[in-house]
């Protein structure tokens, strides 16, 4: 598998390392506006290949993406302490459009995973600018949020996170929606399990949801950025592609019409295999969850409209 990574900040470089450890890539091209940074990362990773599976890793340009099976986009300006993901939109949209033009030119048949925040909006801009197959362009979405929530529940209840089944959908950010109505542990509905183990109630579950939502902010306050967990999440996404696992993951995908949400990239459960997104699964949400999901979609739609209006303004004024 040939993998291209655009953007070698902490997320991009951590992702490259995670992929090397997984052993998927026979070839990995690293692209960054700071060519020396990309060269340094390539050398550092190459020196680790005696301890991993052999891989050809090098710094390159967009033209070197030719023949890539997967392209991971992690380029963008970093999130500041206290800054919401949506506030990042204006500073990253133009960067994403430029990347989209280059990826579609040199690797039009690749599967593209957008990681840069705000991931839902930037995935939408990438898709529209590139004109690529919507099944092959998606964002990392709420894969990490889902993992965080499962971990919190598992730690509290004394189970493995792998035995906890609950999804976080919607925006990867402040308006994300935990789907409690479909949550299960070992095949037992979470509400029933709570009655059995008597370790939690609705307030504790709400606290878990809030902790999941605030997790990135908490980490950023302490160390400036999140990068290890998201890198592992992206490597997990690539694993599903590489092995054609057809796993169900909450990715930010383009929706033509999903529970009333149209023309938007937002996280919902999908099956992912070697050809990209194969199926979009419609959840049976309760009224409260459906309302929250549509509200989340509305927030993202407004953000897209705002940045589009600003772009048009710049073009009309020659800015």
Swiss-Prot record:
Beta-D-fructose 1,6-bisphosphate binds at residues 150, 165. Gene3D superfamilies: Lactate dehydrogenase/glycoside hydrolase, family 4, C-terminal (3.90.110.10), NAD(P)-binding Rossmann-like Domain (3.40.50.720). It is found in: Cytoplasm. PROSITE patterns: L_LDH. Keywords: Allosteric enzyme, Cytoplasm, NAD, Oxidoreductase, Phosphoprotein. It catalyses: (S)-lactate + NAD(+) = pyruvate + NADH + H(+). SUPFAM superfamilies: LDH C-terminal domain-like, NAD(P)-binding Rossmann-fold domains. The active site is at residue 172. CDD domains: LDH_2. Pathway: Fermentation; pyruvate fermentation to lactate; (S)-lactate from pyruvate: step 1/1. The keyword Cytoplasm applies. Allosterically activated by fructose 1,6-bisphosphate (FBP). Belongs to the LDH/MDH superfamily. LDH family. This is L-lactate dehydrogenase. It comes from Thermotoga sp. (strain RQ2).
